């Protein structure tokens, strides 16, 4: 668009595992390995070998015009994650389209609601809202295109299902931005990419809170 002409815009750099890993390392308690979703789908990596899984979606969604096919959760990945949860796993999911990309069919909605314990309640279109409250702090994410961070124009409003509970809310407006579930397994789902949190200190604190939720008795 014309107002963006001549402006460098940050896009997908795919170093998200590094950003997540740095926040994990900041806790001083955990080590991590990263792999592609294809490695998991092809059985090269088994989720059950890990007590905690961090599923990084970023800006991935199904896009008919894209050359590559991306779906937030492919059918194979839905089966693998369901099995991991049934085995008592802990999974963190974050991305800008975790709800909207899975809302199209009954089967996809059943997976997100029954297994991951969240429902979709629209996307956040108010561009002035870049603050999120949760875990005892206020964090910020970039909503408009800029040179330093990739923008999140329409993060998802996701709501808790069953006994899950809201953990983050968009400000102002108070729509739910993230949920957590604690049962025979635990889930923590963010309607925005974790790596889009602007402050490194905030990322470290939020990650410590999430890992604490997964590991507390």
List PLM regions with ranges.
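Aromatic-Pro/Gly-enriched surface loop or interdomain linker
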Residues: 1-52, 56-59, 194-196, 208-217
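C-terminal and late-domain segments of enzyme folds
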Residues: 143-186, 191-217
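Active-site-proximal beta-strand/loop segments in catalytic clefts of secreted hydrolases
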Residues: 36-38, 55-60, 94-98, 169-172, ...
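Residue-level detector of buried hydrophobic side-chain packing
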Residues: 24, 53, 88-91, 184, ...
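Soluble non-cytosolic domains of exported or imported proteins
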Residues: 10-18, 68-75, 201
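Extracellular/periplasmic catalytic domains that process cell-envelope and extracellular macromolecules
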Residues: 25, 45-49, 84-87, 159-161, ...
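A glycine-rich, often tryptophan-bearing local segment used as a flexible ligand/cofactor-contacting loop or short
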Residues: 60-165, 171-172, 206
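Alpha-helical scaffolding within the catalytic cores
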Residues: 37-44, 75-80, 172-177
């Amino acid at each position: 668009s014309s107002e963006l002409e001549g402006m460098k815009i940050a896009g997908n750099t795919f170093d998200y595992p590094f950003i997540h890993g740095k926040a994990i390392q900041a806790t001083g308690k955990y080590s991590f390995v990263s792999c592609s979703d294809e490695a998991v789908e092809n059985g090269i990596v088994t989720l059950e070998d890990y007590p905690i899984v961090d599923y990084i979606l970023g800006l991935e969604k199904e896009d008919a015009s894209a050359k590559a096919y991306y779906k937030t959760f492919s059918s194979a990945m839905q089966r693998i994650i369901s099995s991991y949860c049934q085995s008592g796993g802990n999974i963190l999911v974050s991305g800008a389209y975790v709800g909207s990309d899975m809302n199209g069919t009954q089967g996809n909605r059943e997976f997100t609601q029954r297994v991951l314990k969240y429902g979709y309640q629209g996307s956040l279109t108010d561009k002035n809202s870049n603050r999120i409250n949760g875990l005892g702090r206020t964090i910020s994410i970039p909503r408009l295109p800029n040179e330093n961070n990739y923008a999140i124009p329409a993060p998802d409003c996701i709501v808790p299902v069953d006994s899950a509970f809201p953990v983050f809310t968009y400000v102002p407006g108070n729509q739910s931005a993230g949920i957590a579930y604690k049962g025979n397994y635990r889930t923590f789902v963010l309607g925005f990419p974790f790596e889009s949190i602007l402050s490194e200190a905030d990322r470290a604190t939020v990650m410590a809170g999430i890992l604490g939720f997964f590991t507390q008795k």
